Design a protein with these regions (language model features):
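A short acidic, Gly/Pro-enriched loop at the edge of an enzyme's catalytic core
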Residues: 77-89
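Nucleotide donor/acceptor-binding cores
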Residues: 18, 41, 87
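A short glycine-rich, Lys/Arg-flanked "PGG" loop and its adjoining helix->strand segment in the class I
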Residues: 102-114
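Conserved beta-strand signature within the Rossmann-like core of class I S-adenosyl-L-methionine
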Residues: 115-123
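Glycine-rich helix-loop-beta junction characteristic of Rossmann-like nucleotide cofactor-binding loops
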Residues: 10-15, 36
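Class I SAM-dependent methyltransferase SAM/SAH-binding core
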Residues: 21-79
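Conserved SAM-binding loop and adjacent beta-strand
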Residues: 1-9
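A short SAM/SAH-binding and catalytic strip from SAM-dependent methyltransferases
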Residues: 88-101
Length: 126
């Protein structure tokens, strides 16, 4: 596993019951690390690439089958998560607010549960 992604997930301080949203999940490596810390919580991971989502879902098949994870193909600005709320929303090396910053900010703010936090990582934490 990537030490950089381990450091990212450590910085998230994932709790067993957390509801976590990853934006731009790529191959699902960080998703695996998050799911290993969940017990009753759930990860929703999105990426605009169907190939990346397929790879991430394969990598995390046991977590998907256990109901700890779901993987969705979607652009951030088009993502419809209904009334779901998240304790932690994170992205690694993804520019969340460059295409339609106002819409992206509005969506992320709506998805955050009271007391929830947004994490953006471009370099290893530390």
């Amino acid at each position: 596993m990537s030490e950089r992604l381990r450091a990212v997930v450590d910085a998230l301080d994932v709790r067993p019951g957390d509801r976590v949203l990853e934006i731009g999940c790529g191959h699902g490596v960080a998703a695996t690390l998050v799911c290993e810390r969940l017990d009753g919580g759930r990860l929703t991971a999105v990426d605009r690439s169907p190939k990346m989502i397929a790879a991430a879902a394969r990598r995390n098949a046991t977590h998907v089958e256990a109901g700890r994870a779901e993987f969705l193909v979607a652009e951030l600005e088009e993502l419809d998560l209904g009334e779901r709320r998240f304790d932690k929303v994170f992205a690694v090396r993804v520019g969340l607010f460059h295409r339609d910053p106002d819409r992206a900010r509005s969506l992320v703010n709506r998805w955050l549960a009271p007391g929830g936090k947004l994490f953006e990582f471009f370099d290893p934490p530390g």
